[in-house]
């Protein structure tokens, strides 16, 4: 009987002790759901297919953009970013509207919707072959081709938007670089005709609420560096990296500036007039440039040294006449976001 009584007392004490805890307990808050699978759909021609890069499925611009999206969205809880690249080398706007690429894109969008995925981005690189097939044509033929493009390119964008339905995907179209690097203001020149087609692309994008990665002005002056021209018309690895950067900026997902810290020199008197400038600059997606400015004037780009994990340079102030200076370091990331840091220094022997 004593044992029974003791057991009852222990049970009563435990129940009494736990009662206040139960009274104070609150319902569990459900964990916020992660982002669904993010889908990136790449459409277009041989540029979008990554043709003539060293590794098309690694260095082609859609794969580079996918990698950037993955860095960005996985940090927000997305399980993955899936790239579906339907680009067809040789595709024109006319063949796009009538061929398999658009049909397959529609099926991809429906499949994503059915499995609960989100088509987050669509890139469209179309029109290059519409331009190329008119090479060597007379003015009347080129005008007829341009008039047709004014119908087919907007129709292609409208078909993509219709397929997306209520899915709020971001559409980015790319313009085309001018291999001649001529004067686009010179009516009738190759550069002028390329500019006319690019203007159709820009205007059509505006009408459909799409964004523009404006390749042409950025490639101007860099054709031999960023393409295989004159042996081939396609962009090389460096060119695709530049297109990817422009697309990433146009998408506008990354609004976070990099972090910048000046490690050397410290504020105050300098030990010599050729100080080493050492900077840490970090970004979740990537830093593209770190500049040194002195009293607001650009001096040089600092160079990243992997073994140091820092950006380094030397400021040559031997001819600097003022007793002091403000050193500003400005870092830019892939999305174009910028951040800066400053340090005030006094020069010796002033």
Describe each model-derived feature in a short phrase.
Residues 257-349:
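Long, low-complexity serine/threonine/glycine- and acidic-rich segments characteristic of extracellular
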């Amino acid at each position: 009987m004593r044992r029974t009584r003791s057991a009852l007392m222990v049970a009563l004490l435990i129940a009494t002790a736990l009662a206040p805890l139960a009274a104070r307990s609150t319902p569990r808050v459900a964990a916020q759901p992660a982002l669904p699978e993010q889908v990136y759909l790449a459409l277009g021609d041989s540029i979008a297919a990554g043709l003539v890069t060293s590794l098309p499925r690694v260095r082609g611009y859609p794969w580079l953009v996918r990698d950037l999206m993955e860095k960005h969205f996985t940090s927000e809880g997305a399980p993955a970013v899936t790239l579906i690249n339907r680009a067809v080398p040789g595709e024109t706007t006319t063949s796009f509207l009538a061929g398999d690429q658009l049909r397959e894109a529609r099926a991809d969008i429906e499949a994503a919707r059915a499995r609960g995925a989100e088509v987050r981005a669509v890139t469209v690189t179309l029109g290059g072959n519409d331009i190329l097939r008119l090479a060597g044509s007379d003015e009347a033929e080129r005008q007829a081709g341009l008039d047709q493009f004014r119908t087919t390119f907007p129709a292609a964008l409208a078909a993509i938007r219709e397929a997306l339905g209520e899915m709020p995907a971001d559409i980015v179209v790319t313009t085309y670089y001018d291999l001649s690097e001529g004067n686009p203001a010179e009516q009738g020149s190759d550069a002028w005709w390329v500019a006319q087609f690019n203007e159709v692309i820009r205007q059509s994008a505006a009408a459909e609420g799409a964004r523009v990665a404006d390749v042409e002005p950025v490639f101007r002056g860099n054709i031999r560096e960023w393409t295989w021209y004159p042996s081939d018309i396609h962009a090389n690895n460096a060119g695709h990296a530049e297109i990817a950067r422009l697309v990433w900026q146009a998408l506008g997902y990354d609004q976070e500036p990099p972090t910048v810290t000046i490690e050397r020199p410290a504020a105050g008197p300098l030990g010599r007039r050729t100080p080493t400038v050492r900077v840490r600059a970090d970004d979740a997606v990537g830093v593209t440039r770190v500049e040194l400015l002195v009293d607001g004037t650009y001096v040089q780009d600092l160079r990243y040294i992997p073994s140091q994990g820092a950006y380094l340079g030397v400021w040559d102030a031997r001819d600097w006449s003022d007793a002091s200076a403000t050193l500003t370091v400005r870092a830019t990331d892939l999305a174009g976001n910028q951040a800066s840091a400053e340090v005030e220094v006094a020069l010796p022997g002033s």
